[in-house]
Amino acid sequence: MNICILDGYTTNPGDVSWAPLEALGNVTIYELTKPEDIAERAKDAEILITNKTVLSAETINALPKLQYIGTLSTGFNVIDCEAAKQRGIPVCNVPTYCTTAVAQFTFAMLFNITNKVELHNQSVHKGDWVNSRHF
């Protein structure tokens, strides 16, 4: 199985192992891919994985061996899903990516707004607390 990752650097700058994918077949990883380079880089791909690299209908139709498209994101906005559907190519995403981190960030922002965390942080850094006669 030939697996092509078009923009591996966007999700793995080197701190994650690609070994699970490599166990499935021949994996070729490109850090980033320009639109004009997709057809050449993915010409033998049966599995194509992207994150930010756009896969247009023209691109999808130019890859005769393509059997599967995966996006390393929650959204499908970079893939022409209709073109893939017409070719019978499944397209999958990572729907639970960052769910916990998004929830944590949401609560952090709520605390920042309700407790004025940033205002107090700036006050401490300006020396307001250490210079206050009450502390």
Q: Over which residues does each language-model region extend?
A:
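Phosphate-binding beta-alpha-beta segment of Rossmann-like dinucleotide-binding domains, i.e.
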Residues: R87, P95-F135
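Structural motif corresponding to alpha-helix initiation and N-cap regions
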Residues: G14-D15, L32-A39, T53-A57, V78, ...
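Short acidic/histidine-rich motifs immediately flanking catalytic phosphotransfer sites
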Residues: A42-I47, P64-Q67
